Amino acid sequence: LTKRAQRYAGFATNFGCYIPKTMPFGLVSAPFTFSKFMAELLKGCEDFCVPYLDDVAIFSNSLDEHVKHLDVILRKIGNAKLKIKPSKCSLGRKTVKYLGHVVGNGIRSPVEAKIQAIVNFPAPKTKTEIRRLIGMIGYYSRYIKDYAKIVEPLTNALRGKNKREQITWTPECQKAFDTIKGKLVERPVLHAPDYSKPFIIQVDSSNTGTGVVLCQRDEKGEEHPILYLSRKFIKAELNYCTTEKECLGIIYAIKKLHHYLDGQPFKIETDHNPLVWLKSNVGNNQRLMRWSLALQPFNYTIIHRPGKSIKHVDALSRV
């Protein structure tokens, strides 16, 4: 810390005044400052390294390449006079635990300890406890099919002006609680995106919500999910006609997933046949015309698939 910063970081106790010479934990600006420092330190290594505060993930295609990448990173850290604790390092692994996920071999899944914490979570008795539970499971919502539908009884229990009042734990709440636990215990797996292959967005909307799956197909034609999305329609959107609701699902998907889709062709699969003509003919519907214009920067093709062939997306929309 600079001399000026040391004065502001100091604190007084019964035993005297303590002034840190280096940045301690607990300062409001510490995460930003350290993140900026690590980003500058590892500049030029973005192709094989991702820093997050004091965690550095290094990924390589082979062991020889990994050794070279390690050498580059360790030299940069050494030149900056930073220290690494060996017991907290994990080198040359096929899979690693990173930010609550087990990552490696092109797939990711939730960390077992995090799942166990949710499984051991007692039935909530207050709105505060429900929010804590939803916060825990919400981090893994992209692993769970029809997540919005499953947690609906829990989110409905949060209604009311009093944010801390006791709740009535209904059988529907218990069922949602048990279902979420069961879904996570199954150890869901998501695949890493392969940018050499086209992305596929599968969209299906019901009367009350929309469900989305981002996936890719391998050489055998098997679908591999990358993530799941779903949301309810707000009050105004509930009044939309069927075609508008289906198109709204596409708009929602592309807004959420544009960083996967920018600059490359992709397919949109829907069970609503009229949307196949979205690019060329939307009639006189002003809302569909605006959405069609909003989609023009993207290179997409809409393909009709019967609802029976995309059941997992159909389930996501039943919220």
Regions found by a protein language model. Give the residues of each.
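Short, Lys/Arg-enriched alpha-helical microdomains
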Residues: 311-315, 319
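C-terminal accessory regions
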Residues: 267-269
